[in-house]
């Protein structure tokens, strides 16, 4: 019964996906097939839709971290857990709730041990804009603590890798929007000095991740409609180009005799 409900819920989500999006352009489609333990470190421009989009596109299940306050009501908590979402709390949601983040991080580490994939929104909040905001420390804490535990425990499983992800929507309100998803290069523990203090490690990691995300996220002023249109312009469809070519070619052959006669007469 539970499996049937989950399948129905997933089918509803896929239907919404088909309604909401016109085209999805991915710079590195092969990234969707990555098999190693993976943390998707992503910007957060469009709330719940960001997580649903990546979960549908990846070949394997993607667990995502969501605002802890939406888990307060039992109904929503059960629904979100079925959608593979885990709560993460910020100071604004109550300092007393921050300790629950340790349970969520432990759950993430178990997912990594099983070779799974987790999505985290590294900006820490959702804002409808074409801009990469400063990164919070949550991603750095989860990543560095996981790497340290893997090294200390001589883990036989593959080491966690971090994949920077930039999601860019042509619109935040219109239905039938285009989406550009840009994947960066994988970040591994070998690029970090894990013997530093926590503060230095978190700062070092965030600088590396911010640099990796910057070219993946479109930078457009809210009222710059010209740049927005140019940035999200799609290449011409090859089939349409071919269909337009046929009448153009036909017109050329029909008008060629008249053109050649006029050219000869003028000369």
Question: Could you say what each language-model-derived stretch is?
Answer:
Residues 93-100, 201, 234, 238:
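Juxtamembrane loop-helix boundary motifs flanking transmembrane segments in multi-pass membrane proteins
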Residues 195-234:
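Long, charge-rich alpha-helical interaction segments
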